[in-house]
Amino acid sequence: MVTNDKGAVSIKHAVMEGLARELWEHDEITPDAENQLIMSISPGPHATWRCCVYKEREILRWRIRLSENLDASPYATEPNPNVVQVIDPACEECPLSTYSVTDNCRLCLGKACQNSCRFGAITMTESRAHIDPNKCKECGMCANACPYGAIAHLERPCRKPCPVNAISYDENGICQIDDKKCIRCGQCIHSCPFGAIASKIDVLDVIRDIKAGKEVFAMCAPAIEGQFGKDITMGSIREALKEVGFTDMVEVGLGGDMTAAYEAEEWSEARKEGKKMTTSC
């Protein structure tokens, strides 16, 4: 499956694996260990996934903080309550959402785009139509009217999938997340091609609890069985997790079955009384 976040996920996994190994073997993660991890992922002298090694290493520093369940920014003066956070140095400051005329424009006689615009934002040049971004209200009427489909809606990948319009941008074009609107769905995380949005991770806290001798139960969705090949079963996954240090594994589908049973009883009573009720997923 082709996705926007394949490169970012591989870097995330490299950071998480390095930190987990360090904590498991040495009981703590020192600044020196963090620097060694950064240099192992971005050794230089040439950059491999961003413009320069210095940018790569700064991005890794922010990612390490998120992997340690800390706020991404080491320079923040106030705590960030959101688990979904922006890695500022990774943000490419993509062009803001706008409608743009492409080479498909034939400068036709009908000028449906211009006639459909209620704000006078479209004029004609010698080669194509032109949209004035200062007048455009992004209503999309011109794009719908063009018979050639020559007008494209260029929208930032992080903002496009957000169902609650929680993403905006500062004066420099850096992505900002409105914590009051954000529902932590993670759509922006997977949509950003530069991996500039990520979430806090509590894997290291789990490792600390296991090493401290606490009872820690792994809760796995039934779908986990399909991620490791046909010869891997829920039973083998359970044994592997217990070998790692978990007390036991519980399939969350069991909780779903229990919920369905309780809801069936609740619905039966509601039906007798002529009431309506919703169900969980």
Per-segment meaning from a language model:
Residues 1-145, 149-159, 165:
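Ferredoxin-type iron-sulfur electron-transfer modules and their immediate structural context
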Residues 1-63, 67-69, 199-281:
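Iron-sulfur-associated redox domains of electron-transfer enzymes in respiratory
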Residues 101-186, 190, 195, 200-202, ...:
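Glycine- and small hydrophobic-enriched segments that form the cores of compact globular domains
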